[in-house]
A protein has these predicted regions:
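Acidic, PIN/NYN-like endoribonuclease modules and their adjacent C-terminal/linker elements
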Residues: 1-2, 7, 11, 16-19, ...
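Bulky hydrophobic/aromatic packing residues
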Residues: 13, 26-27, 41
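Acidic, metal-associated active-site segment
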Residues: 35-49
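Acidic, metal-binding active-site segment of PIN/NYN-like and related structure-specific nucleases
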Residues: 48-62
Length: 126
């Protein structure tokens, strides 16, 4: 799996993915900072990236209209970089067991200090 980290999240998530054996890039480091959400999604789809974001409303809506996508990881809470890293590391463990999230979303949330993980399908009906 390859990951594209949205600019709303810390660049340190690239290192978290790398440490777990995955390829990852941050939007700001690939010349895409400031791009509109639909353009980020298009780039992720064209390059077969799983997009990692905490912009759940916009990207969930954009991805739901796509017939095929590599997947979406949403870190729901708006937390500091250290907690983002912890949540993303947990998401990577979940994905290692689950497999590639083609046409799926993995939502990661916090219940107190405990992370919760929820997979669901998200693609154009058809």
């Amino acid at each position: 799996m390859r990951f594209l980290i949205d600019e709303c999240l810390t660049v340190q998530l690239v290192a978290v993915a790398g440490h777990a054996g995955y390829e990852a890039y941050h939007v700001a480091h690939v010349g895409k900072a400031g791009w509109k959400d639909w353009h980020v999604m298009q780039h992720a789809r064209e390059q077969d990236f799983v997009l990692v974001t905490n912009n759940d409303v916009d990207f969930r809506q954009l991805y739901a209209a796509q017939p095929l996508h590599a997947g979406l990881v949403i870190l729901i809470p708006n937390v500091d970089g250290e907690k983002q890293q912890r949540l993303f590391a947990g998401a990577l463990q979940q994905l290692a067991h689950h497999g590639e999230p083609v046409n799926q979303v993995l939502e990661v949330d916090l219940d107190g200090e405990n992370a919760t993980f929820y997979f669901y399908d998200l693609s154009l009906p058809g």
